[in-house]
């Protein structure tokens, strides 16, 4: 988790503080010294996100961030992302997570943009989603 902050050149005390804060955000406080191979798949994903958060990025690029997370950790990640001052660019097939996380939604199908608008509008449009081979989020079914 501390690798990014160390590589960026922060002083050791700053690295420790940023790492502790990031681990706390993702609810992995007790895992600071744990070998990666001892973490579950979901914990590995959260640890990777924590590592990025040590840099306080202005933009986060996330690919399927909710995949391999149990419902509790999905909610935790959602709360983290909602409260970050960072902009998010998120690729996901989990449209319920997208709805909860994103203000603006773009839908791509076969490499082409087929929709761009507020999540409330785009993710309720059954015909549009079906044309892109997607299903309505569960909350709208």
Ranges and model annotations:
Residues 98-100:
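A short, surface-exposed alpha-helical micro-motif characterized by mixed small hydrophobic
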Residues 35-39:
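Conserved ABC ATPase signature
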Residues 116-117:
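ABC ATPase "signature
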Residues 60-63:
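Catalytic Walker B motif of ABC-type/P-loop ATPase nucleotide-binding domains
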Residues 13-31:
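Conserved ABC ATPase "signature" region
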Residues 92-93:
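H-loop/switch region of ABC-family ATPase nucleotide-binding domains
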